[in-house]
């Protein structure tokens, strides 16, 4: 197949470098499986790569819940901790923090103090995503009482690596050194329903795919092709990272 020609019929390959343009490539170990042609992110400690800009921090605001005898259920990564309010928010927060630290693996909870009294601060121990739901007195209040954030930082795009097909694996595996393109031309994986035009801005989503949508995403370069077929149902485009 003609990977460097017009790809009207042929398939491109995710993570394949393109042409003789100047390139900047660095090497960083993988914390988890990393897919070719997707953006990668440095974890909170900046020591390894993860495959998404995960919401690894969260704040749960319970400060308004001072009425006694109301049920609070906080679910974190499918594990639920509960408390029936006592009328003293500090007591209820302390109980929830204790239960979270005992029962929810890989998550550390701390109680807010001073101006943050009545809040619970959550952190993923390994920079992975926090999936949180908060129910108060039978009502889902997640949207109004839970805020999430990410310490993960965009690093570049995972380069195709032939040796990673050992034992039929088509990814970088945990602890393997990942070749990461910071600057240059590379075939990338598109987000769903994205059809870029040449020289339109290329943005990275939190999932590591590429889009033309700016809202909530990271500008990393320009598209240099339209949508092309990858393997299976995967859709790709050529991007110039800058």
Q: Where do the protein language model's features map onto the residues?
A:
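Extended, beta-strand-rich, solvent-exposed assembly scaffolds of outer structural proteins
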Residues: 59-136, 197-203
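Autoprocessing Asn-cyclization modules and mimics
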Residues: 21-24, 28, 53-71
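C-terminal basic regulatory modules in eukaryotic proteins
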Residues: 137-149
């Amino acid at each position: 197949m003609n990977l460097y020609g017009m790809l009207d019929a042929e398939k491109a390959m995710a993570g394949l470098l393109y042409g003789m343009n100047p390139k900047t490539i660095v090497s960083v170990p993988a914390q988890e499986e990393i897919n070719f042609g997707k953006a990668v992110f440095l974890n909170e400690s900046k020591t390894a790569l993860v495959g998404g800009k995960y919401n690894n921090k969260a704040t749960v605001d319970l400060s308004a819940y001072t009425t006694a005898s109301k049920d609070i259920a906080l679910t974190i990564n499918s594990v639920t901790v509960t408390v029936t309010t006592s009328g003293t928010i500090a007591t209820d927060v302390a109980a929830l923090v204790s239960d979270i630290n005992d029962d929810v693996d890989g998550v550390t909870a701390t109680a807010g103090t001073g101006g943050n009294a009545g809040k619970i601060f959550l952190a993923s121990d390994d920079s992975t995503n926090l999936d949180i739901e908060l129910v108060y007195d039978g009502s889902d209040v997640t949207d109004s009482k839970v805020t999430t954030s990410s310490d993960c930082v965009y690093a570049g795009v995972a380069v195709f690596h032939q040796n990673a097909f050992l034992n039929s694996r088509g990814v970088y595996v945990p602890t393997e050194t990942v070749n990461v393109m910071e600057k240059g031309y590379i075939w990338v994986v598109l987000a769903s329903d994205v059809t870029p035009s040449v020289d339109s801005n290329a943005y990275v989503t939190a999932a590591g795919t590429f889009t033309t949508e700016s809202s909530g995403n990271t500008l990393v370069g320009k598209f240099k092709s339209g949508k092309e077929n990858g393997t299976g149902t995967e859709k790709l485009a050529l991007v110039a990272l800058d």
